Amino acid sequence: MAAAPPAVAVNGGGMAAAKVASQAYLESKAVKDTRVLIADLCKQFYTLGWVSGTGGSITIKAHDDSIPKRQQLILMSPSGVQKERMEPEDMYVLATNGSILSSPSPKPYPYKPPKCSDCAPLFLKAYDMRNAGAVIHSHGMESCLVTMINPLSKEFRITHMEMIKGIQGHGYYDELVVPIIENTAYENELTDSLAKAIEAYPKTTAVLVRNHGIYIWGDSWISAKTQAECYHYLFDAAIKLHQIGLDWSTPNHGPIQNVKVKAGMNNSNNRIEPLPRCIVLDIEGTTTPITFVADVLFPYARDNVGRHLSATYDTAETKDDINLLRTQVEDDLAQGVDGAIPIPTDDAGKEEVIAALVANVEAMIKADRKITALKQLQGHIWRTGYENNELEGVVYDDVPEALEKWHALGIKVYIYSSGSRLAQRLIFGKTNYGDLRKYLSGFFDTTVGNKKETRSYIEISESLGVDKPSDILFVTDVFQEAFAAKGAGLDVMISIRPGNAPLPENHGFKTITSFAEI
């Protein structure tokens, strides 16, 4: 083992970091064993094609029960070294802030001078943001190719595969979602994109880099390695399913739908049926994953209520939002709604009013209430998020092509969601596929009526001016909404997407797993 040199910061830090780790810890059995482990894993990963051509890397924390995990030393494989020839003494030892505490000794020609992994800043993000115990960076071919199948996709999705059970927090029936970030010329330039993906996808344990590879982390080296094996298996399965024309992202893994329609729609008997004059789409579970709303939009609104109200308190828009909330809360208090607390008058002062508003809004969001006062405020908060590039709408990969096709056929497409019309426009105005509003003719929200009431769909059909309600096709993932729309005479299909609620047996509705089936 080379003597510990002066601390050199990879990602901030300095001499003070060197004092964190005693010489005894640096020379401990935990550190020595981790050096050996990384060398062994590099050899194994080389045979799997994950770290060929000196690419890829691995980092593991030196576990010591007497030291809190966040303070444990970090060991990393070096950059530009043949991974199958790695030796224990080749590893770098870093403090938690990225300062190098121990470097490998230079080797004679033809070896290059030692250099810490270019992945170090990205590894440190996973350690800091997820309290990881180990991180693997793989250049496995399957992790590269799977990002190329759809070069516009921002996510990899797969469901109903046994190996999903090997991914932390997932089961067989779950939809596994892995974010995809764009590659850059230099590894460290990926740091911000990786951090944003980790923040935006709180359930993920991996981030794909298009045309490059994948970063995978776990609580321990065993967890990271196990998940890495499962991820690579699933990517390989998706590629092979794609090659034989099967869709890996749907529960039944049926044929990939790529229907080209010109004069009508093919039904199950391959007869051409007249096209609908209008299509009305739900959002959650239909155009957009439920997880986007639950894991991204709702938390963003919840976490930014106070900031938004403080910054805009004196504007006419926010005064209107507050008045709506006051009215709603007064009604909630009268009805004994759980979580409702009185909102002081303006005389109590801005901070007192905002504190009460925040408490009520948080309770409403937690209860997933579909009320206008909440939806209107959320829309205004989300607007700021989109304007500041803190939010980006997400739609399923089959949605943009379908919208474009329907638009070309002269079919008018509308949105009907419990979210406000503003929130709807925001989602489709800035998506992972760009601005899709050019394909949409209008937006309906709960001001037209409750989505589970037939009267709402009668109102929509009268607003659209169709000759008969059956000229409208309504697509939703919710049985009660489908039932209400059918009662108004609309043609109805139910969207089956991973994570959607199960349907009653013998529900009697047509179902689709992709817009390509419409």
Curated annotation (Swiss-Prot):
It comes from Populus trichocarpa (Western balsam poplar). Its EC number is 4.2.1.109, 3.1.3.77. InterPro entries: Aldolase_II/adducin_N, Aldolase_II/adducin_N_sf, Enolase-ppase_E1, ENOPH1_eukaryotes, HAD-like_sf, HAD_sf, MethylthioRu-1-P_deHdtase_MtnB, MtnB_viridiplantae. Its cofactor is Zn(2+); Mg(2+). Pathway: Amino-acid biosynthesis; L-methionine biosynthesis via salvage pathway; L-methionine from S-methyl-5-thio-alpha-D-ribose 1-phosphate: step 2/6; Amino-acid biosynthesis; L-methionine biosynthesis via salvage pathway; L-methionine from S-methyl-5-thio-alpha-D-ribose 1-phosphate: step 3/6; Amino-acid biosynthesis; L-methionine biosynthesis via salvage pathway; L-methionine from S-methyl-5-thio-alpha-D-ribose 1-phosphate: step 4/6. This is Probable bifunctional methylthioribulose-1-phosphate dehydratase/enolase-phosphatase E1. Pfam families: Aldolase_II, Hydrolase. Residues 1-247 are annotated as: Methylthioribulose-1-phosphate dehydratase. Binds 1 zinc ion per subunit. Binds 1 Mg(2+) ion per subunit.
